[in-house]
Structure formats: structure tokens, C-alpha cells
């Protein structure tokens, strides 16, 4: 029977801790008995409804049944989204019992462990009969339990101290058990985020044991919301469980759901399976997407289908209980903006901490593990096995005498609209650090699975190498070809060292992917591969292999003739490697510039023994011959009619390129952008993700996938002819910037790419503006000594400029070569690999600032993005001189720069000579190692800082000198965002 309305129950008089879910259910049944709390839907719409009155009757029935059976104190529930799922939980709580929600994918082994660990005596089920059998577990079906309208009404006050024992996913073995106290539900029922609009109707589409599921039904109960349950009879042809869930979401939207609390990837999958791509659901008011990383295009993909929905990326953990974070800048996810999460009001203290649980400074860019102090967290893990104890000690910590939860996720302090929050960087295990740079293995996995040759895949970082384990999509997939295709997709020909096929992905006892077994398999395959390498006999080569083995931390390379770049010798390790070789063999020449990407210990030994290391294999004469030979293949100047409607822009995704594109769009100029991607659609998505203001919705902006190193950029005949007929001006900015690669390695992109641009420019002719790098050496190579000292990047730019000169000499009237200085953004964005800001950060951290050897101020050649945009579009239109490279930078006083740094960063800088500063830098790099900002660029630092003293040889500077205020603005904005350790 229902509660007697004559009973003197005053719900308003109870304390907040006493306002348990049972008390709230009774309150709702009394005050709003006809409120529809649960609705069941299928593909035809709502097929059943249950009010609080009907819900309470079923709860009373199950509660009497539980007492009659004499169930134990801890009871398992093995159910899907069905009426008896919630009714059983309420009934068990009302009779003083703790609930454990069983996951349907748990194996017999996992169930045995959990039953023993938690002393579970009984299990309730209804539609879904358990597939496991445990001798000590009594399974009881509620399917045949009829409604008993005479069953006594439950009452509050008998609830157990522990309400639910939640569980982790179990991805590393047996799931961890987390008790959650009954009293905490009333303290944080809205998870501290009332923006969730808990009164809205919400479908239950994810696993019943999932933390977001508990969030949904608890806050719906406390806020008089409405739950939508998918009928088990929904008819849909599905190839996977994920697709079945996606159909459940789709039919919930058709049934009029107002809110989705959902996994991001499930939401995206739902939009993909929709039969009518033009269909939209204006009834949906809110989407909270959490539980996994948010795809960059989620907001914009959803906005058309859910036009009236507020879309929040959501973040939290099962361990933190009723704590939730929201990212209010979710709409910026496609605009190269990092999501910034803010905690709800249940968080008393938010910190980022080190592995030793020391708080990191609350400054933008500081990294640590997310840690919260709150009154509504779960209790520490239950269990006495070694792994549980270790996890418990590292997760549930004490901070200033208060219990706290340390998440497994790394994050950095960030800000949005002036408020400090956190940006999630991912789990430590799937996020690896190489040379001070973090790589997301999960991102690599997603890229690989997108290839047609791969069914499933996981990447690993072993012995400083990225390796892939994959399940082929069909027979005959060649691992070598797959590696080449993957590296091309990732735009780094040596990123992945090896690909190893696997028949199927192994699963652990919890049904999750067994990453440990896969990584062990990858390590064994890699070891076998290393053992097959040729054995070295040359003593010099053997010594070189020992050096490589030590630097790459891979003992198996010792004595083997291994291709070093494929074994993890990237740009930063190569600095240490070649420096070690020069020290070991007492060499004086710049041996690193003699190396190519296929170098091995034997090939390096050959160079050393021939004593050819001090003369570059690329001579001044060869560079000129290369330029002459290439220029002869470029067609002669031709006068062609052209519509001249478009500008062509290469390098639009670059640091300056994307800002220049924004500038052109503001001027209402039509632009064709060539973007390095696999398809036009991928090129558009990438460009939109980088250029916030860009909307590719008209013919004014055309985006094509292209590769500058390929013939005609890899475009088909129709696209090439379009460029010939419709482009009047070309801005060529695309380049491969790499300070350690040789000329031959950079020639395809930087030289042949410029050749293709010139081939297009002679058709018309079309005005060509070639932006030749930024801040690199301004030297005219006139002897082999200079060519031996120059980097491969500088050599490639030299030949590209030489090509432009030769075509200009043949009569092309509209070729401009522009040499900027160090390019810095007026909006303050700092490029992590940018030399200039690395130098500034180093100087501030060391507390000393360089001057010239005569104690005079250094001069920095700086080009701000705003001023450079004006230069390229306005000033150059007035230039009519004969061909000569044009300088485009502001000469900014170094001492004035130092004063700005002191003021904005509140530090005191001592001035020293450049030579003394470089000595201090060498010591600083030795102490900090490869994490030092200038580790990889130490060899180029002196030249870069002295570049202002290089004579300009009469070259004209066309930079708007009246715009010095823009330089100061860019410096100030950059310093605002610069993090100093």
C-alpha cells in the first residue's frame, strides 16, 4: 500500500543529510504523486509511463519480497534499464541493504573475486539472466514477482550507511570497488553543476553501472525530472553493441527527450547512423558529454541536429563521486581552443599535484594530476590485494588534513574569460613524453583505425620508439607499406618504427582490452626485429652503435647496423648523438649535416674514416647547379587571360598562415587554400579547427587537400586548370621547418614546392609573394665554407630564393621574396617549438640577459603577425623595383625588450655579454638535459642572436616602421602567456 497521507511526515523539517533518496522518493510520491518519473520508449515513441505512485508500489512489493527472503546485507543487481532496476535499488536501501550493480560483461572470474571481496550473498535480476554461476551467490528472479498493492509502505531511516559500491571499468584487471555513502547523495545530488538542468527528460542509454547513469537518475529524482528507458524490444539492425546504443539514443530524441548525458563518441555515432541526415530535434535543450575525450568537431557536428541545445563537455571520475566539471567553451572545440574545465560547487578545493602529491603553482601551463577536496567523494577502494592497496594509496590521499581524491588524469592550469580552470591532457599510461613533448597514443590509434587497411590497433612507446600493433582489415596487409602510409598521414616519415600484425585484440577478465598483453607482444616483436639487424665488424661503427644504444636507451642496438632514425633518433636525440660522436672521436667538423634519414653506424663510420666530415657534401656549386637545372624545367612566361578572382595561399594552417587567411577573409578576398591532408573534407576540418573565424560556406573560400612536394601539388587536372584560370596572386608560405634535417631531406617540400609555385605563377603571369621563412639566417652563400656551416633548412631556402631569382631574370615581373624576422603573434599565442620564445623563457629562468660583446644592446628582428599582414597586402603593391629579397621586420632594441620582461614577469635580469650568456646556457642545458627549451637549438642560438649584426647588403626593409606599437603589443601579449618554470 502507499503511505498513509494522514501520517505526520514533515519533509521540510528534516536535515539535508537525512534527505536521502528514500526520503526524497516518499516526498515526491506524496507531493506530486502523478508526476511521470519513468517513460519507456521504442522506435514508435513512448509506450509506457510510470508515476511516482506506481513506482512506489513496485518498490514496496520488492522491499517486502527482500525481507521475506531474508537477503543479506550486500546484494547484487544484474539488470538493464528496466523498471525493476531503480525499484530494486530503492527497495534494498529501504530495507537497510547495500547495492552492487553488476556489469553484464563481467566474467565468471571477475564475479567470483567481487563476490568474495564484498561478501555479496544474493543477486537480483529480471529480464537479463546472469551467464555466470558462483556457488556462494544466490540468484533470484523478479520476473514472476506480481505487484502487491497491499505490501507495507517503505519508510526512511533504515537506509544502510553504504548505499552503492561502484566499480571502475576494470581495464587493467579486476575492477576496483568504491563504496559511496548514503548521506552524500543529498549533499551533492546536482553534482555541483545546476547547469545540468536536472528537471529535463533524460534517456538512460549507457550501462547501468556507469557513473554518468547514476548521475542522471539521482539528480532527476531530486529535481522532479523524467527518465526515458529504451524498451528491450526496440527493433534495429545493428552490427555492434555501440550501434545498438546509438539507435537507442536516436529513438530517444525522436521520443522528445530534452537532455542527453552521454559519451561523446556515442553521440557522434548516433548522428552518423541517423537515416535522415536533415532531421533535427529542437526539443533537446542540453547535452552533457563526458566519460571520455571530446572529439574536436563534436559541438559543431551536433549543433545542426540539436539547434536549441546547450552543449557542455563534462568531466569527472567514479572515485570523485558527486563531483562534476564543465567546460563552458565547448563551442570552441573546433577552433583550436583547448577545453577549460571548471568544477561545480561540490568541490571545496581544486589542485594539480605532482606524483609526490605536492601542489603545483596555480599558473597557466603548470601541469599535474587533478586533485579535489570535497564532501561528496566516494570512499577508498575495498580490497586487500597488492594492486588495490597501491591504487588506494595513490588515489585517496590526505591534503592539509582533509581527505582528497587524486585523479589518474594529467591536466594543466588554463584560463577562459579570465577565470582559472584546467585543461585535461589525458591518462599517463596513454600519453607519453619524448624529448619534453607529450604524445597522445590514443590519437595515433584513432588515426590508424581510420585507414582502410586496419580493423583495430593500439600504439605503444617502447625504447624511445613508436610501434603499432594492429588487426588487419583483410588478408595481405603489408606491415611495411602500412608503416609508410601511417607516417605519411602523421606527416613524419620516421615517427613509427614498426607495425606488427595481430590476429585479434586480447581481452582481460573484465572484458576490456588487455593492453599489457599487447604491449608485451609488441616488445617481443621489436626485440626479434632488433636481433635480426646486421652485426657490425668495423670497430669505429661498433663504438658508434654503443653511443646510439646509450642515447636511445636500447641495449639491443649495440653492435648492430641499425637505421638510427627508425630506431628513435629524432631531432633532439640527434643533437646529443652527434655531439657525443664528435667528442668521442675528437672531430671538429659539423658531422650532423652529412647525415641523412637512412644513416647507420656503418655509414657514419665511413664518413669519419674518410675524414670527409668537415666538408659538406652539399657545396655552393652543387646548390647553384640544382637551382639552374630546376629552373630549366619551368615553362616560359605566358600571357594568359585570367578571371583573377582568387588568391592562392599555401601554408594556411601555419602559425602565420592561418592569421593571414583571417586577414584576407576580413578584406572579403576569395582564397584557395592548399592544406596537407588526405582528402578535401579532412583539409576543411583541419583548417576550420585552426582558424576560429572561418566559415567555409560559400565559394569565396576553397580548401583542397594538397602536398607541396608532389607534382602540381598532387592536384588533378581540373583543379590545376582552375588555379591557372582563376588565380591572380600567390602567397607561398608552406615549408617544412626542421633544424636538424639535411638539404636533401628538405628539398622536396622547400625547393620542389617552390618550383611548382613558380610553374603556376608563369601562367598569366601571376604575382608571387614568397615568404622565405622567418628569423632564419640572412646570408648570401658565396663559398663552400658557408654552405658547410649552414643548416639544411637554410640551404633549402637559399635554393628556393635562387629559383625565384632565375625566373625573375627570365622576365617574370611580379616575384617578391620576403624575409621576415622572428614572427610573433599580436594575439599572444606562443608556438611551443618557436626559437624566440624558448630563448626568452630561458633568459628569464636564468635571470640573465645577453648584450653584444661590446656591452651594447642586441637588436631583435621581429615581425608581428598584424604588421606582416599589412605589409603583404598593402605596401608591396607599391613596390616596383627589380628583383631583390625584401626584408620585413621591426628592429627592436634588446635592452628595451628586457625591461618589458622585468616589468611583466616581476623578475630582475642581469646584463651579461653574449659569450658569458652562452656559457651559462651550456651549463643550464647540461643540468636540465633534453627538457631544456633550447636543448635541440643550442647549436644555433649564437648565430640566431647575432643575426641582427649581419649586414643587409643593401636589401630594403619594407616593414611599416610606424607600427612599432604593434611589436610592443605582441611582446606584452606573448609574455602574458609565457610560462616560466
Curated annotation (Swiss-Prot):
The modification O-(pantetheine 4'-phosphoryl)serine is found at residue 571. InterPro entries: ACP-like_sf, Adenylate-forming_Reductase, AMP-binding_CS, AMP-dep_synth/lig_dom, ANL_N_sf, Far_NAD-bd, NAD(P)-bd_dom_sf, PP-bd_ACP. It comes from the Eukaryota. Residues 535-612 form the Carrier domain. CDD domains: SDR_e1. The keyword Lyase does not apply. One of its GO terms (cellular component) is cytosol. The keyword Secreted does not apply. Keywords: Ligase, Phosphopantetheine, Phosphoprotein. Belongs to the ATP-dependent AMP-binding enzyme family. NCBIfam families: Thioester-redct (TIGR01746). This is Uncharacterized protein C162.02c.
Amino acid at each position: 500500500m502507499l503511505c498513509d497521507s494522514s501520517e505526520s511526515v514533515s519533509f521540510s523539517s528534516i536535515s539535508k543529510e537525512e534527505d536521502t533518496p528514500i526520503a526524497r522518493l516518499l516526498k515526491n510520491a506524496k507531493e506530486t504523486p502523478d508526476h511521470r518519473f519513468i517513460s519507456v520508449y521504442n522506435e514508435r515513441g513512448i509506450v509506457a509511463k510510470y508515476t511516482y505512485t506506481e513506482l512506489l508500489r513496485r518498490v514496496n512489493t520488492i522491499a517486502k519480497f527482500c525481507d521475506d527472503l531474508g537477503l543479506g546485507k550486500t546484494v547484487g543487481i544484474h539488470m538493464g534499464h528496466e523498471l525493476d532496476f531503480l525499484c530494486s535499488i530503492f527497495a534494498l536501501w529501504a530495507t537497510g541493504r547495500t547495492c552492487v550493480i553488476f556489469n553484464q560483461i563481467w566474467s565468471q572470474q571477475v564475479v567470483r573475486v567481487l563476490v568474495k571481496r564484498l561478501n555479496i550473498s544474493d543477486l537480483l535480476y529480471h529480464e537479463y539472466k546472469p551467464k555466470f554461476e558462483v556457488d556462494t551467490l544466490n540468484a533470484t528472479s523478479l520476473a514472476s514477482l506480481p505487484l502487491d498493492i497491499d505490501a507495507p509502505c517503505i519508510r526512511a531511516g533504515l537506509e544502510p550507511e553504504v548505499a552503492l559500491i561502484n566499480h571502475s571499468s576494470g581495464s587493467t584487471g579486476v575492477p576496483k570497488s568504491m563504496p559511496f555513502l548514503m548521506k552524500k547523495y543529498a549533499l551533492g545530488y546536482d553534482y555541483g553543476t545546476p547547469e545540468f538542468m536536472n528537471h529535463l527528460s533524460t534517456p538512460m542509454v549507457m550501462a547501468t553501472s556507469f557513473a554518468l547513469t547514476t548521475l542522471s537518475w539521482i539528480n532527476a529524482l531530486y529535481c522532479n525530472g523524467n527518465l526515458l528507458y529504451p524498451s528491450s524490444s526496440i527493433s534495429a539492425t545493428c552490427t555492434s553493441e555501440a550501434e545498438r546504443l546509438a539507435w537507442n539514443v536516436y529513438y530517444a530524441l525522436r521520443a522528445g527527450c530534452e537532455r542527453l548525458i552521454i559519451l561523446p563518441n556515442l553521440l557522434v555515432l548516433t548522428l552518423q547512423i541517423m537515416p535522415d541526415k536533415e532531421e533535427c530535434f529542437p526539443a533537446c535543450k542540453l547535452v552533457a558529454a563526458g566519460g571520455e575525450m571530446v572529439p574536436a568537431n563534436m559541438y559543431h557536428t551536433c549543433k545542426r541536429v540539436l539547434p536549441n541545445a546547450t552543449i557542455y563537455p563534462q568531466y569527472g571520475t567514479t572515485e570523485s563521486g558527486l563531483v562534476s566539471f564543465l567546460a563552458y567553451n565547448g563551442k570552441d572545440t573546433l577552433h583550436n581552443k583547448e577545453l577549460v574545465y571548471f568544477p561545480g560547487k561540490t568541490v571545496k578545493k581544486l589542485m594539480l599535484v605532482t606524483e609526490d602529491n605536492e601542489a603545483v603553482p596555480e599558473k597557466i601551463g603548470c601541469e599535474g594530476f587533478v586533485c579535489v577536496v570535497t564532501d561528496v567523494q566516494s570512499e577508498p577502494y575495498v580490497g586487500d590485494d597488492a594492486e588495490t592497496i597501491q591504487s588506494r594509496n595513490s588515489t585517496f590521499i590526505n591534503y592539509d588534513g582533509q581527505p582528497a581524491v587524486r585523479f589518474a588524469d594529467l591536466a594543466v592550469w588554463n584560463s577562459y574569460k579570465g577565470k582559472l580552470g584546467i585543461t585535461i591532457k589525458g591518462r599517463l599510461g596513454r600519453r607519453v613524453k619524448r624529448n619534453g613533448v607529450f604524445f597522445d597514443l590514443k590519437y595515433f590509434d584513432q588515426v590508424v583505425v581510420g585507414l582502410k587497411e586496419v580493423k583495430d590497433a593500439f600504439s605503444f612507446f617502447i625504447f624511445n620508439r613508436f610501434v603499432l600493433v594492429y588487426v588487419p582489415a583483410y588478408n595481405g596487409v603489408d606491415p611495411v607499406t602500412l608503416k609508410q602510409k601511417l607516417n605519411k598521414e602523421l606527416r613524419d616519415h620516421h615517427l613509427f618504427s614498426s607495425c606488427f600484425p595481430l590476429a585479434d585484440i586480447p581481452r582481460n577478465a573484465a572484458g576490456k582490452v588487455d593492453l599489457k598483453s599487447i604491449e608485451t607482444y609488441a616488445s617481443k616483436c621489436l626485440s626479434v626485429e632488433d636481433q635480426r639487424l646486421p652485426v657490425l665488424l668495423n670497430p669505429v661503427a661498433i663504438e658508434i652503435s654503443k653511443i646510439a644504444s646509450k642515447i636511445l636507451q636500447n641495449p639491443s642496438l649495440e653492435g648492430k647496423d641499425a637505421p638510427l632514425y627508425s630506431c628513435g633518433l629524432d631531432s633532439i636525440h640527434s643533437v646529443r648523438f652527434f655531439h657525443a660522436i664528435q667528442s668521442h672521436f675528437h672531430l671538429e667538423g659539423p658531422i650532423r649535416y652529412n647525415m641523412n634519414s637512412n644513416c647507420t653506424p656503418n655509414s657514419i663510420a665511413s664518413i669519419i674514416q674518410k675524414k670527409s666530415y668537415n666538408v659538406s657534401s652539399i657545396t655552393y656549386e652543387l646548390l647553384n647547379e640544382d637551382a639552374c637545372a630546376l629552373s630549366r624545367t619551368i615553362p616560359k612566361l605566358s600571357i594568359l587571360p585570367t578571371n583573377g578572382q582568387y588568391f592562392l595561399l599555401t601554408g594556411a594552417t601555419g602559425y602565420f598562415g592561418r592569421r593571414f587567411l583571417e586577414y584576407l577573409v576580413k578584406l572579403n578576398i576569395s582564397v584557395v587554400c592548399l592544406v596537407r591532408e588526405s582528402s578535401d573534407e579532412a583539409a576543411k576540418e583541419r583548417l576550420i579547427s585552426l582558424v576560429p573565424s572561418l566559415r567555409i560556406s560559400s565559394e569565396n573560400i576553397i580548401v583542397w587537400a594538397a602536398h607541396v612536394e608532389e607534382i602540381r601539388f598532387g592536384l588533378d587536372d581540373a583543379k590545376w586548370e582552375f588555379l591557372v584560370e582563376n588565380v591572380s596572386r600567390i602567397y607561398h608560405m608552406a615549408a617544412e621547418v626542421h633544424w636538424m634535417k639535411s638539404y636533401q631531406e628538405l628539398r622536396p617540400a622547400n625547393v620542389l614546392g617552390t618550383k611548382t609555385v613558380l610553374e603556376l605563377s608563369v601562367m598569366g603571369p601571376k604575382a608571387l609573394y614568397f615568404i622565405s621563412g622567418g628569423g632564419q639566417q640572412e646570408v648570401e652563400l658565396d663559398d663552400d665554407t658557408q654552405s658547410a656551416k649552414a643548416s639544411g633548412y637554410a640551404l633549402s631556402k637559399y635554393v628556393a630564393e635562387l629559383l625565384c631569382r632565375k625566373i625573375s631574370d627570365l622576365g617574370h615581373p611580379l616575384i617578391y621574396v620576403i624575409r621576415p624576422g622572428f614572427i610573433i603573434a599580436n594575439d599572444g599565442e606562443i608556438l611551443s617549438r618557436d626559437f624566440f620564445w624558448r630563448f626568452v623563457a630561458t633568459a628569464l629562468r636564468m635571470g640573465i640577459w645577453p648584450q653584444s660583446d661590446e656591452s651594447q644592446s642586441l637588436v631583435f628582428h621581429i615581425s608581428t603577425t598584424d604588421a606582416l599582414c599589412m605589409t603583404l597586402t598593402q605596401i608591396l603593391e607599391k613596390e616596383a623595383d627589380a628583383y631583390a629579397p625584401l626584408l620585413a621586420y621591426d628592429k627592436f632594441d634588446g635592452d628595451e625588450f628586457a625591461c618589458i620582461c622585468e616589468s611583466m614577469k616581476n623578475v630582475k635580469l642581469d646584463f651579461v655579454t653574449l659569450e658569458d650568456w652562452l656559457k651559462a646556457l651550456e651549463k643550464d642545458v647540461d643540468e636540465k638535459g633534453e627538457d631544456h627549451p633550447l636543448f635541440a637549438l643550442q647549436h644555433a642560438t649564437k648565430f640566431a642572436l647575432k643575426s641582427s649584426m649581419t649586414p643587409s647588403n643593401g636589401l630594403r626593409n619594407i616593414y611599416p616602421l610606424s607600427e612599432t606599437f604593434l611589436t610592443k603589443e605582441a611582446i606584452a601579449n606573448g609574455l602574458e602567456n609565457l610560462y616560466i618554470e
